[in-house]
C-alpha cells in the first residue's frame, strides 16, 4: 500500500472534519452569545451549556489542526516483513479471523479512514495496541491485556 497516499487520504478527511467542526463551533458560539441564551432564572443553564460545548469544540478544532501539521511534516518510512514495527508503520493484523489495518502515528489515535477499500485506523505508540505492536515483526503475535481479557493479534503484513 502507498502510505503517502494514505496520509493524503487522512489529511483530506481531517480537513473536511475541520471545516464541519468550525461551522459547528461558530453556530454554538452564536447560540452561547445570543440574547435568548441569557438565563431567565437561576436554574436556566442554556448559555452555560452552550459555552461548555463551544469550549469542547474549540479543543477538537485545535486537535485536528495539530494532527494536520504532524501529518504534513510526517517522515513516512518504508517497512518490510523483517523490519520491526515503529512509527509510520502500516500494520495488517488478524484477530478472531478478521483482518484490521492500523497506521502508527504519534497523535490522532482512533481516527479511521477508508483507503483502497479498507478501513485504516490510526493507533498511537502509547495506546495499548500501539505498545503491544512496537518492535514486533511480521508473523509475531501482539498481546493486549484489558482487565481479565487477553487479545492476541497476529501480524500479517507490515508496510
Question: What are these regions, as identified by a protein language model?
Answer:
Residues 1-80:
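N-terminal intrinsically disordered, low-complexity, charge/repeat-rich segments that act as generic
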